[in-house]
Regions:
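Extreme N-terminal starter segment of soluble prokaryotic enzymes
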Residues: 2-5
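Acetyl-CoA-dependent GNAT
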Residues: 8-14, 18-94, 105-107, 111, ...
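Short, charged low-complexity linear motifs
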Residues: 9-11, 114-121
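Residues at secondary-structure transition points
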Residues: 33, 41-42, 99, 125, ...
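Conserved glycine-rich acetyl-CoA-binding loop
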Residues: 69, 89-106, 113-115, 125-132, ...
C-alpha cells in the first residue's frame, strides 16, 4: 500500500483521465448497459468539454498512482451544505483489490472532513458489484433513482450514503 499515492488533477490531466476511463468503462459497464448507452454516456460524461465543465463546476478530480503509474481516478464535490458526493471512482481492473478503493475513499474523506462534511453520497448502478464494496466500507442505500440522461437512456442507480458525523468529531479532536 505504501506504493500508492494520490495527486490533485487539473485541466492538463483531462487526456490522462479519458485514457484511464476508456480502459475501465467498457469492462465495467458492457454487461450492464447496451453498447449504444455505454458510448453515449462516455461522450456525455467524458468528452474533453464535459470534463472541463465538471472541473469548472467544482468537481475535484484526483489521480491514483501505484509506483508512479496512473491506475485510477476519482472526482467529488459538495452538493449541498455539509453533503459531498463521490461523482466517480474508477480503478483499472488489473489493479482491483488490495485496498486501493478504500485508500481513495479515505483520502477523499480526510479532505472533505476539513471542509465540514457530515456525509458522503454516491450513485452506483443497481447491478454493479461495486455496491458490495461500498457497503463493506460503511455506505448504506438511502434510495433508488432512475435518471433520464437523454437519447432514451436511463441511469438506474442506488443512491448510497456514508455518515461522517462521528468521524468529523474525531477529526476535529485530532487537530
Amino acid at each position: 500500500m505504501s506504493s500508492l499515492t494520490i495527486r490533485n488533477a487539473s485541466i492538463a490531466d483531462i487526456e490522462l483521465i479519458r485514457e484511464l476511463n476508456l480502459q475501465v468503462w467498457p469492462q465495467t459497464y458492457s454487461h450492464l448497459q447496451t453498447p449504444g448507452q455505454v458510448n453515449y454516456m462516455l461522450d456525455m460524461m467524458y468528452s474533453k468539454d464535459a470534463l472541463e465543465k465538471q472541473m469548472a463546476d467544482g468537481h475535484q478530480f484526483i489521480i491514483l498512482y501505484d509506483k508512479h503509474i496512473p491506475i485510477g481516478f476519482a472526482s467529488y464535490g459538495e452538493i449541498e451544505e455539509h453533503i459531498f458526493k463521490l461523482h466517480k471512482l474508477y480503478i483499472l481492473p488489473a489493479h482491483h483489490g488490495g485496498g486501493k478503493g478504500r485508500f481513495v475513499i479515505d483520502f477523499i474523506k480526510n479532505d472533505i472532513l476539513t471542509k465540514g462534511a457530515e456525509a458522503l453520497q454516491l450513485n452506483v448502478n443497481r447491478k454493479n458489484v461495486a455496491k458490495n464494496f461500498y457497503e463493506k466500507i460503511g455506505f448504506k442505500v438511502i434510495r433508488s433513482e432512475d435518471k433520464d440522461i437523454g437519447n432514451g437512456y436511463f441511469m438506474n442507480d442506488y443512491v448510497m450514503e456514508k455518515k461522517l458525523t462521528n468521524e468529523h468529531e474525531e477529526f476535529k479532536n485530532s487537530l
